[in-house]
Protein backbone atom coordinates (compact mmCIF):
# COMPACT_ATOMS: atom_id res chain seq x y z
CA UNK A 1 0.00 0.00 0.00
CA UNK A 2 1.34 3.42 -0.99
CA UNK A 3 1.46 6.06 1.71
CA UNK A 4 2.97 9.55 1.76
CA UNK A 5 5.55 10.36 4.39
CA UNK A 6 6.95 13.73 5.46
CA UNK A 7 10.65 13.57 4.57
CA UNK A 8 11.53 17.23 5.05
CA UNK A 9 10.23 20.38 6.74
CA UNK A 10 11.24 24.00 6.10
CA UNK A 11 10.08 27.44 7.16
CA UNK A 12 10.75 31.07 6.37
CA UNK A 13 9.93 34.32 8.16
CA UNK A 14 10.67 37.79 6.71
CA UNK A 15 13.38 39.99 8.21
CA UNK A 16 11.09 42.73 9.52
CA UNK A 17 9.90 41.90 13.05
CA UNK A 18 7.12 44.02 14.58
CA UNK A 19 6.53 43.73 18.32
CA UNK A 20 3.29 44.48 20.12
CA UNK A 21 4.87 47.59 21.60
CA UNK A 22 5.70 48.84 18.12
CA UNK A 23 2.12 48.23 16.99
CA UNK A 24 0.90 50.18 20.01
CA UNK A 25 2.59 53.26 18.54
CA UNK A 26 0.23 53.23 15.55
CA UNK A 27 -3.04 51.75 16.87
CA UNK A 28 -4.81 51.89 20.22
CA UNK A 29 -3.57 48.70 21.85
CA UNK A 30 -0.85 47.41 24.19
CA UNK A 31 1.41 44.43 24.60
CA UNK A 32 -0.58 43.36 27.66
CA UNK A 33 -3.91 43.59 25.80
CA UNK A 34 -2.67 41.53 22.83
CA UNK A 35 -0.84 38.86 24.84
CA UNK A 36 -3.75 38.35 27.25
CA UNK A 37 -6.29 37.88 24.45
CA UNK A 38 -4.22 36.08 21.82
CA UNK A 39 -0.84 34.91 23.09
CA UNK A 40 0.83 36.88 20.28
CA UNK A 41 3.99 38.83 21.13
CA UNK A 42 5.33 39.65 17.68
CA UNK A 43 4.83 39.11 13.98
CA UNK A 44 6.99 39.31 10.84
CA UNK A 45 6.12 41.54 7.89
CA UNK A 46 7.28 40.97 4.32
CA UNK A 47 9.36 43.65 2.61
CA UNK A 48 7.57 45.80 0.04
CA UNK A 49 9.26 43.99 -2.83
CA UNK A 50 8.81 40.52 -1.30
CA UNK A 51 6.11 38.29 -2.77
CA UNK A 52 4.34 35.23 -1.43
CA UNK A 53 6.24 33.12 -3.96
CA UNK A 54 9.57 34.45 -2.66
CA UNK A 55 8.82 33.25 0.86
CA UNK A 56 7.39 29.97 -0.43
CA UNK A 57 10.60 29.30 -2.36
CA UNK A 58 12.79 29.90 0.70
CA UNK A 59 10.72 27.50 2.83
CA UNK A 60 10.66 24.94 0.01
CA UNK A 61 14.45 25.04 -0.41
CA UNK A 62 14.91 24.28 3.27
CA UNK A 63 12.36 21.46 3.14
CA UNK A 64 14.05 19.93 0.10
CA UNK A 65 17.45 20.19 1.76
CA UNK A 66 16.05 18.58 4.90
CA UNK A 67 14.55 15.73 2.87
CA UNK A 68 17.58 14.98 0.71
CA UNK A 69 15.30 14.98 -2.34
CA UNK A 70 16.58 16.52 -5.58
CA UNK A 71 14.38 19.29 -7.00
CA UNK A 72 14.16 17.43 -10.32
CA UNK A 73 12.47 14.53 -8.52
CA UNK A 74 9.54 16.69 -7.41
CA UNK A 75 6.40 15.63 -9.32
CA UNK A 76 3.85 17.99 -7.75
CA UNK A 77 3.83 21.42 -6.09
CA UNK A 78 0.75 22.51 -4.15
CA UNK A 79 0.75 25.99 -2.64
CA UNK A 80 -1.90 26.87 -0.08
CA UNK A 81 -2.39 30.63 -0.06
CA UNK A 82 -5.05 33.30 0.03
CA UNK A 83 -2.54 36.02 -0.89
CA UNK A 84 -0.95 34.94 -4.20
CA UNK A 85 1.45 37.24 -6.05
CA UNK A 86 -1.18 37.92 -8.71
CA UNK A 87 -4.76 36.93 -9.46
CA UNK A 88 -3.17 34.62 -12.04
CA UNK A 89 -0.99 32.74 -12.79
CA UNK A 90 -0.96 30.57 -9.70
CA UNK A 91 1.64 31.14 -7.03
CA UNK A 92 2.60 27.47 -7.40
CA UNK A 93 3.69 27.86 -11.03
CA UNK A 94 5.83 30.87 -10.08
CA UNK A 95 7.37 28.79 -7.29
CA UNK A 96 7.98 25.96 -9.76
CA UNK A 97 9.82 28.37 -12.06
CA UNK A 98 11.94 29.89 -9.29
CA UNK A 99 12.87 26.46 -7.91
CA UNK A 100 13.46 25.05 -11.42
CA UNK A 101 11.38 21.97 -10.65
CA UNK A 102 10.99 21.24 -14.36
CA UNK A 103 9.33 17.84 -13.93
CA UNK A 104 6.54 18.97 -11.60
CA UNK A 105 3.02 20.20 -12.24
CA UNK A 106 1.81 22.91 -9.91
CA UNK A 107 -1.37 24.56 -8.65
CA UNK A 108 -2.74 26.61 -5.74
CA UNK A 109 -5.36 25.67 -3.17
CA UNK A 110 -7.36 28.35 -1.35
CA UNK A 111 -8.93 27.39 1.97
CA UNK A 112 -7.40 30.28 3.93
CA UNK A 113 -6.18 29.11 7.37
CA UNK A 114 -7.19 25.50 6.60
CA UNK A 115 -5.32 25.60 3.32
CA UNK A 116 -2.29 23.59 4.37
CA UNK A 117 -4.43 20.69 5.64
CA UNK A 118 -6.37 20.72 2.36
CA UNK A 119 -3.11 20.80 0.40
CA UNK A 120 -1.72 17.89 2.43
CA UNK A 121 -4.84 15.84 1.74
CA UNK A 122 -4.66 16.53 -1.99
CA UNK A 123 -0.95 15.73 -2.28
CA UNK A 124 -1.39 12.62 -0.14
CA UNK A 125 -4.10 11.32 -2.45
CA UNK A 126 -2.02 12.00 -5.56
CA UNK A 127 0.77 9.93 -4.01
CA UNK A 128 -1.56 7.14 -2.84
CA UNK A 129 -3.08 6.91 -6.33
CA UNK A 130 0.36 6.39 -7.87
CA UNK A 131 0.15 9.52 -10.01
CA UNK A 132 3.12 11.14 -8.24
CA UNK A 133 5.95 10.01 -5.98
CA UNK A 134 7.20 13.30 -4.52
CA UNK A 135 5.22 16.41 -3.67
CA UNK A 136 6.12 19.81 -2.27
CA UNK A 137 3.32 21.11 -0.05
CA UNK A 138 3.66 24.77 0.86
CA UNK A 139 1.66 27.24 2.94
CA UNK A 140 2.63 30.87 2.32
CA UNK A 141 0.96 34.20 3.06
CA UNK A 142 1.50 37.97 3.06
CA UNK A 143 -1.47 38.71 5.31
CA UNK A 144 -0.07 42.17 6.03
CA UNK A 145 -1.31 43.33 2.61
CA UNK A 146 -4.96 42.59 3.34
CA UNK A 147 -5.07 44.16 6.80
CA UNK A 148 -6.65 47.42 7.88
CA UNK A 149 -3.78 48.70 10.02
CA UNK A 150 -6.15 51.01 11.88
CA UNK A 151 -8.42 48.16 13.01
CA UNK A 152 -6.97 46.77 16.23
CA UNK A 153 -9.41 43.84 16.22
CA UNK A 154 -7.65 42.35 13.18
CA UNK A 155 -4.30 44.03 12.52
CA UNK A 156 -2.73 42.70 15.74
CA UNK A 157 -3.59 39.10 14.87
CA UNK A 158 -1.74 38.38 11.63
CA UNK A 159 1.75 38.05 10.23
CA UNK A 160 3.59 36.92 7.10
CA UNK A 161 5.57 33.75 6.50
CA UNK A 162 5.86 30.41 4.76
CA UNK A 163 6.30 26.76 5.63
CA UNK A 164 6.78 23.67 3.49
CA UNK A 165 6.99 19.91 3.68
CA UNK A 166 8.24 17.31 1.23
CA UNK A 167 5.92 14.32 0.92
CA UNK A 168 7.24 11.15 -0.65
CA UNK A 169 5.86 7.69 -1.36
CA UNK A 170 6.53 5.30 1.48
CA UNK A 171 5.26 1.73 1.76
CA UNK A 172 5.78 1.29 5.51
CA UNK A 173 2.41 0.42 7.01
CA UNK A 174 2.47 2.59 10.12
CA UNK A 175 4.42 5.59 8.84
CA UNK A 176 3.36 8.75 7.04
CA UNK A 177 -0.03 10.35 6.48
CA UNK A 178 -2.46 7.88 8.02
CA UNK A 179 -5.74 9.75 7.70
CA UNK A 180 -7.18 13.13 6.72
CA UNK A 181 -10.69 14.52 7.10
CA UNK A 182 -11.83 17.76 5.45
CA UNK A 183 -14.94 19.80 6.17
CA UNK A 184 -16.67 23.01 5.08
CA UNK A 185 -19.83 24.95 5.88
CA UNK A 186 -20.45 27.65 3.30
CA UNK A 187 -23.46 28.99 5.19
CA UNK A 188 -20.92 30.61 7.52
CA UNK A 189 -18.91 32.40 4.81
CA UNK A 190 -19.91 35.83 6.11
CA UNK A 191 -18.15 35.31 9.45
CA UNK A 192 -14.68 35.92 8.02
CA UNK A 193 -13.96 37.47 4.64
CA UNK A 194 -12.22 40.30 2.81
CA UNK A 195 -14.01 43.48 1.79
CA UNK A 196 -12.78 43.07 -1.79
CA UNK A 197 -12.29 40.61 -4.59
CA UNK A 198 -11.48 40.40 -8.30
CA UNK A 199 -15.11 40.00 -9.39
CA UNK A 200 -16.63 41.79 -6.40
CA UNK A 201 -15.02 45.20 -6.72
CA UNK A 202 -11.63 44.76 -8.35
CA UNK A 203 -9.54 45.41 -5.23
CA UNK A 204 -8.01 43.07 -2.66
CA UNK A 205 -9.87 44.61 0.27
CA UNK A 206 -9.12 44.01 3.94
CA UNK A 207 -10.03 41.35 6.48
CA UNK A 208 -13.45 41.58 8.13
CA UNK A 209 -14.24 39.20 10.97
CA UNK A 210 -16.93 38.38 13.51
CA UNK A 211 -14.28 37.39 16.01
CA UNK A 212 -16.51 36.14 18.82
CA UNK A 213 -18.49 33.75 16.62
CA UNK A 214 -15.38 32.55 14.76
CA UNK A 215 -13.76 31.86 18.15
CA UNK A 216 -16.72 29.70 19.22
CA UNK A 217 -16.79 27.73 15.96
CA UNK A 218 -13.04 27.16 16.15
CA UNK A 219 -13.24 25.53 19.57
CA UNK A 220 -16.25 23.41 18.66
CA UNK A 221 -15.10 22.26 15.23
CA UNK A 222 -11.44 21.65 16.04
CA UNK A 223 -12.44 19.60 19.08
CA UNK A 224 -14.99 17.54 17.14
CA UNK A 225 -12.62 16.89 14.23
CA UNK A 226 -9.86 15.66 16.55
CA UNK A 227 -12.30 13.29 18.26
CA UNK A 228 -13.50 12.03 14.86
CA UNK A 229 -10.05 11.23 13.51
CA UNK A 230 -9.07 9.51 16.78
CA UNK A 231 -12.22 7.37 16.67
CA UNK A 232 -11.77 6.61 12.97
CA UNK A 233 -8.30 5.20 13.69
CA UNK A 234 -9.11 3.56 17.04
CA UNK A 235 -6.70 5.79 18.91
CA UNK A 236 -6.74 7.57 22.25
CA UNK A 237 -5.32 10.97 23.13
CA UNK A 238 -2.66 9.21 25.19
CA UNK A 239 -1.29 7.55 22.04
CA UNK A 240 -0.72 10.87 20.24
CA UNK A 241 2.61 12.57 20.88
CA UNK A 242 1.82 16.04 19.53
CA UNK A 243 -1.18 18.16 18.63
CA UNK A 244 -0.38 20.92 16.13
CA UNK A 245 -3.37 23.23 15.89
CA UNK A 246 -3.74 26.30 13.71
CA UNK A 247 -1.82 29.07 15.46
CA UNK A 248 -4.57 31.71 15.53
CA UNK A 249 -5.16 32.32 19.23
CA UNK A 250 -3.59 30.75 22.30
CA UNK A 251 -6.98 30.68 24.03
CA UNK A 252 -8.48 28.53 21.27
CA UNK A 253 -5.61 26.05 21.60
CA UNK A 254 -5.89 25.99 25.40
CA UNK A 255 -9.68 25.59 25.38
CA UNK A 256 -9.55 22.72 22.86
CA UNK A 257 -6.92 21.03 25.04
CA UNK A 258 -9.05 21.53 28.14
CA UNK A 259 -12.23 20.27 26.46
CA UNK A 260 -10.53 17.09 25.21
CA UNK A 261 -8.33 16.67 28.30
CA UNK A 262 -5.14 16.89 26.25
CA UNK A 263 -2.08 17.54 28.44
CA UNK A 264 -0.82 21.05 27.75
CA UNK A 265 2.71 19.75 27.17
CA UNK A 266 1.43 17.90 24.06
CA UNK A 267 0.25 21.13 22.39
CA UNK A 268 2.75 22.72 20.00
CA UNK A 269 2.70 26.50 20.50
CA UNK A 270 4.47 28.93 18.16
CA UNK A 271 1.88 31.71 17.81
CA UNK A 272 3.82 33.90 20.24
CA UNK A 273 6.64 34.05 17.70
CA UNK A 274 4.86 34.76 14.41
CA UNK A 275 1.14 35.48 15.02
CA UNK A 276 -1.54 34.03 12.71
CA UNK A 277 0.06 33.31 9.35
CA UNK A 278 -3.04 31.65 7.88
CA UNK A 279 -2.04 28.77 5.56
CA UNK A 280 1.58 28.98 6.74
CA UNK A 281 0.59 28.42 10.37
CA UNK A 282 0.69 24.60 10.52
CA UNK A 283 4.02 24.09 8.68
CA UNK A 284 5.60 26.92 10.69
CA UNK A 285 4.51 25.21 13.91
CA UNK A 286 5.78 21.85 12.61
CA UNK A 287 9.12 23.42 11.74
CA UNK A 288 9.33 24.99 15.19
CA UNK A 289 8.56 21.63 16.83
CA UNK A 290 11.29 19.90 14.82
CA UNK A 291 13.93 22.62 15.24
CA UNK A 292 13.33 22.83 18.99
CA UNK A 293 13.87 19.09 19.39
CA UNK A 294 10.27 18.24 20.24
CA UNK A 295 9.31 16.40 17.07
CA UNK A 296 11.05 13.07 16.53
CA UNK A 297 10.89 10.16 14.12
CA UNK A 298 7.93 7.82 14.73
CA UNK A 299 6.02 10.47 16.71
CA UNK A 300 2.27 10.36 16.12
CA UNK A 301 0.97 13.85 15.33
CA UNK A 302 -2.45 15.40 14.79
CA UNK A 303 -2.62 18.53 12.64
CA UNK A 304 -5.86 20.54 12.77
CA UNK A 305 -6.89 23.90 11.36
CA UNK A 306 -9.96 26.05 10.74
CA UNK A 307 -10.34 29.02 8.44
CA UNK A 308 -12.71 31.22 6.50
CA UNK A 309 -15.38 29.59 4.41
CA UNK A 310 -15.84 28.17 6.95
CA UNK A 311 -13.38 25.36 6.19
CA UNK A 312 -11.60 23.05 8.57
CA UNK A 313 -9.61 19.86 8.50
CA UNK A 314 -7.58 17.37 10.49
CA UNK A 315 -4.66 15.13 9.56
CA UNK A 316 -3.09 12.19 11.41
CA UNK A 317 0.60 11.66 10.64
CA UNK A 318 3.30 9.29 11.83
CA UNK A 319 6.62 11.11 11.43
Swiss-Prot record:
Biological or metabolic pathway of the protein: Lipid metabolism; fatty acid biosynthesis
Catalytic activity: malonyl-[ACP] + acetyl-CoA + H(+) = 3-oxobutanoyl-[ACP] + CO2 + CoA
PANTHER family per UniProt: 3-OXOACYL-[ACYL-CARRIER-PROTEIN] SYNTHASE 3, BETA-KETOACYL-[ACYL-CARRIER-PROTEIN] SYNTHASE III
Molecular function (Gene Ontology), one example: beta-ketoacyl-acyl-carrier-protein synthase III activity
Keyword Lipid biosynthesis: yes
TM helices/strands, residue ranges: none
GO terms under biological process: fatty acid biosynthetic process; secondary metabolite biosynthetic process
Active site feature: 113, 246, 276
Intracellular or extracellular location(s): Cytoplasm
Underlying gene: fabH
GO annotation, cellular component aspect: cytoplasm
Domain notes: The last Arg residue of the ACP-binding site is essential for the weak association between ACP/AcpP and FabH.
The entry's keywords: Acyltransferase, Cytoplasm, Fatty acid biosynthesis, Fatty acid metabolism, Lipid biosynthesis, Lipid metabolism, Multifunctional enzyme, Transferase
Listed name of the protein: Beta-ketoacyl-[acyl-carrier-protein] synthase III
EC number: 2.3.1.180
Amino acid sequence: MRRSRILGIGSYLPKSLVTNDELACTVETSDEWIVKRTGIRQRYIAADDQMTSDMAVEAAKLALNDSGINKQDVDLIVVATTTPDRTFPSCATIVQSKLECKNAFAFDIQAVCSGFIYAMAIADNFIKSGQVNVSLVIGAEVMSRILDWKDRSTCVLFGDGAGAVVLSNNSARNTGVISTILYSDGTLHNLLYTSGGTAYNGVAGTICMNGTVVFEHAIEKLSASIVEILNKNNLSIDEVNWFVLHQANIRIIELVARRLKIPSEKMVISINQHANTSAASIPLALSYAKNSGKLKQDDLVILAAIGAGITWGVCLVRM
